[in-house]
């Protein structure tokens, strides 16, 4: 049975995994109206492989880090599929490199209004921090840099990401290793850059 994959942390990525956790198909949609894209393209993907929700083994989504408005799309979709009694598993983008054998590294992305998210790890030790544009001026990263994708960057991050590895590309190339772990029952709380009440707060 197939597994549906959804990543709405940046733009929309949809995929279908076969019973051996290889990709039937993986499709990315950039710069389109996200809510309409998710519903329309999920329907098209399922139709292309002659599947209905009741035929799925489960759903896997990226739980962040990301913006509330983006992550809520995949969360809401997964909530609807509970009517079909489908299990929902989730994981964080920055977990991917460690699972694939990278013992240390830094995963970086633009966050909320001039802030930048950095997840660093070395073996079993890890840390998370948000830094400002000013902090970037003195930031030194000496290990391998990872990013979600090109759309998760801005000009301020470009000096740090010349040789970066995209976790979206790793996901595309190594689905068995990643989803074999996630489908063992992994479920993460959504990781928003800012709480909803802060993200939608009006500027004074």
Question: Where would I find each of the regions flagged by the language model?
Answer:
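N-terminal beta-alpha supersecondary unit
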Residues: 1-61, 146-147
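Short, basic/glycine-rich phosphate-binding loops at helix/coil junctions
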Residues: 21-23, 77, 115
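Long, highly charged amphipathic alpha-helices
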Residues: 37, 41, 76, 152-155
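Conserved strand-to-helix beginnings and helix N-cap segments that scaffold or border functional pockets
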Residues: 39, 71-75, 102
